[in-house]
Amino acid sequence: MKYVGAHVSASGGLANAAIRAAEIEATAFALFTKNQRQWRAAPLSDETIAEFKAACEKYHFGPGQILPHDSYLINLGHPVEEALEKSRDAFIDEMTRCQQLGLTLLNFHPGSHLQQIPEEACLARIAESINIALAKTEGVTAVIENTAGQGSNLGFKFEHLAAIIDGVEDKSRVGVCIDTCHAFAAGYDLRSAEACEKTFADFERIVGFQYLRGMHLNDAKSTFGSRVDRHHSLGEGNIGHDCFRWIMQDSRFNGIPLILETINPDIWAEEIAWLRAQQIAEVA
């Protein structure tokens, strides 16, 4: 079973995210549980929690179909201790909010060394940050997203993801989300079925499909290997349709949220319908 949706707005209340996902006939969705560009947010009220859970139940979204995303401000590998602590506290708050909402996943960008510490030290800090957050929360898996590698962002190599996972003590509560645009921009070819087979064979060898907890399905305005993060609508960018057809026909991507972050929300319903239509020839 493929769960397909988009990163929808939670404007006006978290329950609205589930409603908006249902309106585009999604079977999965992503959301921010707070303003993603602010450090602090008011605690979730009992009413907000109840309304969100009721909306998810009404529209048949289980926890495994929802992939919340944390704030863009958080840097779990920050080289400066004070800023690192601020990020860690904010991440624990994000995990706690997910726990309160009955959600089991939290997607996040791993972190940046800001040209101040070596890659290895930054990756170790990220793993330590995850360990701290997991120790203070229950039931929520930390889902590391691969990046395009802009600036000093880490996570653009599968080896980075593997190194972080290696440093996490509770392997049952860590996973990854692969963003197709980010992977392509980082130098992983996805332009044909053959290229996808090779890229995901590398992923299986280095990270392992057992850790795959979600996907972001985005075409790329950015060019191959450019390390530039620019999303595009499916089939309109430099990746093309073949990659997304291949994913929809491969059972290894079953049972996880497949989330659009493409640039035109007005055609999300069409993109979801197109993706669903590709399953007709699904192969085991």
UniProtKB/Swiss-Prot annotation:
Domain of life: Bacteria
Keyword NADP: no
UniProt keyword terms in alphabetical order: DNA damage, DNA repair, Endonuclease, Hydrolase, Metal-binding, Nuclease, Zinc
Keyword hit for Iron-sulfur: no
Alphabetized NCBIfam families for the sequence: nfo, PRK01060.1-4
Entry function: Endonuclease IV plays a role in DNA repair. It cleaves phosphodiester bonds at apurinic or apyrimidinic (AP) sites, generating a 3'-hydroxyl group and a 5'-terminal sugar phosphate.
Protein name: Probable endonuclease 4
Organism of this sequence: Klebsiella pneumoniae (strain 342)
Gene: nfo
